[in-house]
Amino acid sequence: AGGGPAGVEALVAEARARFTYGHPERRFDDGCAAVPFLGCGVAEGSCVDINTYLVASLRAAGYEAAYLYGYFFPEEKVDSAVDGHCWVATRLDGDVLDWDVAHHIKAGLDPVRPALNPRPGRRALVSHSMGHRYATAEGEIALKLLGEPVWRAPGGAISDPDQRAIRAL
């Protein structure tokens, strides 16, 4: 694959070639201690499967890659998102590119190019794993994962936020 942008593009193309889009009863990595290499054949997978494979491939090759999770609100259903969605971001030489392989597969778009979901709509990002650094009075704090918010009610009860509340943030 070589290095640089061509290497990232080659690994994205490899992940695209290894999957068809779907929600299988058994995931390609069920029962595995590590993400397996898919050397031949094609596996059925959702955005979770495809992007788990892609992030593992990118990181194994030495690229900085993030697994992002959130909600996608299709233009035709702006008031709700039934499921979550995930995608990948890469950072190379200061440039951050988003890769939404699963939605490119669903839309029949090949080759996969750096872009978010090709369908019109809105995204609400709720977790990001590329790492963050924040300056504080005590020094720098590094966080590996920013995760999905939860509501904490008086008395300590924790619940998932309403999707409309997330969209309003």
Predicted regions and their residues:
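Hydrophobic/aromatic-rich core segments of domains that either
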Residues: 49-140
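N-terminal accessory/pre-domain segments preceding catalytic cores
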Residues: 1-14, 96, 130-169
